[in-house]
């Protein structure tokens, strides 16, 4: 008995669909371990970034040193902020721009350069391509990070508390030095400003626009003069935004950056993160990473080989930063 050709075509179509579905279901991000290279002098960071992204949103341990070039050193046990720009594997410490730190009151503060900080444990920390999470032990705050090309999205889960979110444009580590900074309140959920700095790269200028998912109750600005070679060259600004939070309440901090202007940062925020929806942007960034990582498929029964390969591929794709056009 001859099989009709149309039946063979149907079988082939279903087989083809099944093959594509199986390949699409592979989660390549699960093979990426962003903590590889964060020990000794690997100088990598574990935070969140989109492929080729301008934003590298990652935790900072708050201390300078050769092992902490990227802002993060695995043997450390403190976190002193989450900033939006980092260098990976360079051997030269710079950037650390636009650093936020959530706390509950009263908060812990040490002498500079550490400043406001919290203890943390690697048992309460996780990361994969496009996502980072840690629990701040001293404040019982869970922090989650993701990013689009030009925006960083933070989700803080608070206990019932009087809480605050600090934005520190004064903080600098290693080669980095703050030349000038500015913060202005646009409305009860929106701020904008800039940070100018010098370091390994000279005359860096980062502009930002931030939108909170909840109105802040109060804002305080602490400004100090920046003196260099006995000359007043600018102002260092630290802002504190106060909130009352209920148990399990989440506040999103959405920040866009630009190398051109505050208006450009505002346009980037509206274009890439118009909604207060962490899970939506995380899913989009994860899908983006799977598209990039999935361009090379490794056939191996050795899980470690896959982790090593896809982590190396991931690290190669975070070096090609998307240039700002706004």
Please give the residue ranges for each predicted region.
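Sec-dependent signal peptide recognition
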Residues: 2-9
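C-terminal motif of bacterial Sec signal peptides marking the signal peptidase cleavage site
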Residues: 15-16
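Accessory carbohydrate-recognition regions in carbohydrate-active enzymes
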Residues: 22-321, 325
């Amino acid at each position: 008995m001859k099989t009709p050709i149309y039946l063979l075509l149907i079988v082939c179509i279903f087989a083809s669909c099944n093959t594509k579905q199986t390949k699409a279901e592979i989660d390549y991000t699960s093979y990426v371990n962003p903590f590889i290279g964060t020990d000794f002098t690997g100088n990598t960071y574990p935070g969140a970034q989109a492929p080729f992204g301008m934003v590298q949103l990652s935790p900072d341990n708050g201390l300078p040193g050769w092992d902490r070039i990227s802002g993060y050193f695995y043997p450390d046990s403190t976190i002193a902020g989450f900033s939006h720009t980092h260098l990976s594997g360079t051997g030269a410490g710079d950037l650390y721009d636009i650093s936020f730190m959530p706390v509950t009151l009263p908060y812990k503060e040490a002498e500079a350069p550490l400043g406001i900080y919290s203890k943390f444990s690697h048992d309460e920390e996780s990361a994969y391509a496009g996502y980072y999470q840690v629990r701040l032990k001293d404040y019982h705050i869970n922090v989650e990070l993701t990013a689009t090309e030009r925006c960083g999205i933070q989700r803080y889960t608070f206990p019932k508390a009087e809480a605050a979110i600090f934005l520190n444009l004064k903080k600098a580590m290693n080669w980095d030095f703050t030349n000038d900074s500015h913060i202005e309140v646009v409305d009860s959920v929106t701020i904008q400003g800039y940070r100018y700095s010098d370091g390994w790269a000279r005359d860096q200028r980062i502009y930002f626009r931030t939108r909170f998912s909840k109105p802040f109750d109060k804002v305080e600005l602490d400004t100090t003069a920046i003196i260099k070679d006995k000359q007043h060259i600018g102002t260092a600004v630290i802002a504190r935004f106060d909130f009352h939070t209920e148990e399990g309440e989440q506040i999103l901090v959405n920040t866009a950056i630009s190398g051109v202007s505050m208006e450009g940062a505002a346009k980037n925020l509206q274009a890439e993160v118009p909604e207060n929806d962490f899970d939506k942007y995380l899913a989009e960034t994860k899908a983006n990473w799977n598209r990039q990582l999935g361009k090379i498929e490794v056939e191996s029964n050795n899980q470690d080989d896959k982790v090593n390969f896809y982590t190396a591929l991931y690290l190669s794709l975070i070096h090609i930063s998307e240039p700002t056009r706004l």
